[in-house]
A protein has these predicted regions:
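Bacterial Sec-dependent N-terminal signal peptides
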Residues: 1-22
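Non-catalytic cap/lid and distal C-terminal segments of serine-dependent acyl enzymes
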Residues: 20-270
Length: 270
């Protein structure tokens, strides 16, 4: 059945009217027992060809439609130029991309790292291997990409974070303002699993490559700098970039575009 479905999909994509597409799907999560809105941006799909995939995680209060229109407005052009399929799941405004211990309807780590990857590989002509699959996000999505990427090292070969919210312990009152408590409970009982700097050992010997960037005027800059130092101390191979910019669309739109080109360079050398 899968072979027949994939053949049908390939024939549809090869039709001139379906050469390059922005596809909107409702993808069912068995873990959450609900459908998740997801946008898939494809290049010009050709018969008998398989494509790299990058999963893109939006920031707090964002959504895939905003990503296409504002955050990475040239994503369709990049899909065509890089021959890559981009997958944009809806992170539900404030999921923080975790498997919430307090809300069973918010299990986004499993959905994105396992269920969604499996669905995309079954329904699209992908290169179903970690060296052809990446995950990237900014702000809340920067945390999510590192958290999910390191939780599923067998799935993702390259992991990128732009202006990532990397340490909840520094949020203070913003821990509740940004609704982290809705998915992880009170800050006072935050588990070490959700503190990225406590888990850098798991980033060793995974065969993954990591890219982090942050604007020098971003309120998250100090934690990105300290996380970079943690990785250096542990000798975790990564690329760290600082440049002019604040925590806003102007910065991360530019930074994400740069990261996607670095992702392409990674894929081409594997």
């Amino acid at each position: 059945m899968k072979t027949l479905f994939n053949l049908t999909l390939l024939l549809v994509f090869s039709h001139p009217l379906f050469a390059q597409k922005v596809i909107r799907e409702k993808i069912f999560s068995a873990k959450m027992k609900k459908e998740i809105s997801t946008i898939i941006v494809t290049p010009d799909i050709k018969p008998h060809q398989q494509y790299k995939t990058v999963y893109i995680l939006h920031g707090y209060s964002g959504n895939p439609e905003r990503t296409l229109k504002q955050d990475i407005p040239d994503l369709q052009a990049k899909a065509k130029a890089y021959n890559t399929i981009y997958i944009l799941p809806d992170g539900n405004y404030n999921s923080w991309y975790v498997d919430s211990p307090v809300d069973q309807k918010s299990q986004y780590k499993t959905f994105i790292g396992s269920e969604l990857v499996r669905y995309i590989d079954e329904h699209y002509p992908t290169k179903a291997e970690k060296t052809s699959r990446g995950i990237l996000g900014w702000s809340m999505g920067g945390f999510g990409s590192l958290y999910i990427g390191t939780s599923f090292p067998e799935a993702f070969g390259i992991v990128g974070s732009s202006c990532g919210a990397l340490d909840f312990r520094t949020f203070n009152e913003d821990y509740n303002n940004y609704q982290v408590d809705k998915v992880l409970g009170p800050l006072s009982s935050l588990g070490s699993e959700y503190i990225l700097s406590d888990n850098t050992d798991k980033m060793l010997n995974t065969g993954q490559y990591y890219i982090l960037d942050c604007g020098i005027n971003d309120f998250f800059i100090s934690k990105n700098q300290s996380f970079h130092q943690d990785l250096l101390t542990k000798k975790v191979e990564h690329l760290y970039i600082e440049s002019l910019g604040e925590h806003n669309t102007e910065y991360w739109s530019r930074a994400l575009s740069n990261q996607l080109s670095l992702f392409e360079n990674y894929f081409n050398h594997r």
